[in-house]
Amino acid sequence: MTIHTLKNGIRLLHIQENLPVAYCGFAVNAGTRDELENEDGLAHFLEHLLFKGTKKRKSLQIINRLEEIGGELDAYTTKEETFIYAVTPEKYVERAVELLADVMFNSTFPADEIAKERSVVEDEIQSYKDSPSELIFDDFEELVFENSALGHNILGKKKTLRKFNAKSLQNFIKRCYTTDNLLFFIQGNIDFEKVLKFAEKYFDVEKTERNFTRTAPQNYVPQSVEKSKKTFQIHCLIGNTAFSFGHKNRLAQALLNNIIGGSMLSSRLNIAVRERNGLVYSIDSSLNPYTDTGVWNIYFGCDKANFNKCNKLIYNELHKMREKPLTSAQLEKAKRQFAGQLLISAQNRENRLLAAAKSALHRNYCNTEEQTIEKLKAVSIENLYEISQEMFDIERLTVLKYI
């Protein structure tokens, strides 16, 4: 694994692996939280428009450039990053690199394409509103990160979307898509010298630097909010702020989250609420770290008649985590489970590469699964007990209910 910085500030992440396909793309240190007032949804809208025309290609030419050889082009936007990437048979990797560079550096944002894509995103917003189990996560972060751009919905609002034009998109690129904010990642049977030649050929752009800094959310105040929704179930999120992406205790907190409500059926919440009492179809907790803060929450949906029972069982499990430290045997079991999950998830090469690119983008390094597992060994009973005191503190929990 190699991380290298070009003269113009663009960084390269190279992972050589003997594969019949190649993965490559750009990670941009720009997302929803970098939008200014009245720019809600602009980062996501830009991601859509990057594929709608360049100085030498129309939209359909961009689509067909990789699909005609069986390749795929994809993208997504988060609160802090935008990813634009491709997978292609290894012998066509240069085709993918050239296309990605064209999209990144030469997009033109035709007015007719902006109008069409605005309609597409408006439909996406409406579809999202029809899915309470997804929408509630955005509404929850809006409460936790109140008065911060980090609380903004990624898709934005229809009223701001209708104001966006080519100038809006170009201004966002100029402000946020600076070369020091770009990382190009590539994985496959390609040596590093070849990657450098690709970069020299296709990434020959002027060096630019971001001239603003992000402001961390301040003064978290727990809230309890009910929203009226026409649903058969109550949907509920209970949660708290969490450690940032680079915090020394983030791995320990991730282990603690896995114990209380991770993806395994043996999590404490799943055992207590579903397996023993049959009150929900699913219940889980998730941890979402950002560069300067984070958010942790528990999600469940249940019949309205069962809500109080579910709530009592959940708070009981949180109380037990704060009152009684894990035993040595419980800790070793939790570490063994977590390590196994890491190794299995790493078999999804695309997700693994995207995670490595995110780490390299923000911290300029990325751990292997083996390195993470080695760090996991240092997590102690005392670490977890100390973290649980604040993480599961009832007085610090924000609660959002759709009823």
Predicted regions and their residues:
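A glycine- and charged-residue-rich anion-binding loop/surface
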Residues: 10, 14, 32, 154, ...
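N- or domain-start disorder-to-order transition segments that initiate the globular core
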Residues: 1-21
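Glycine/small-residue-rich interface belts in oligomeric ring/scaffold proteins
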Residues: 54-61
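Charge-rich, well-structured scaffold segments of protease-associated domains
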Residues: 5, 61-210, 243-244, 261-263, ...
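His/Glu-based metal-binding/catalytic segments typifying zinc-dependent metallopeptidases
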Residues: 16-20, 25-27, 209-267
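Active-site SXXK
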Residues: 41-54
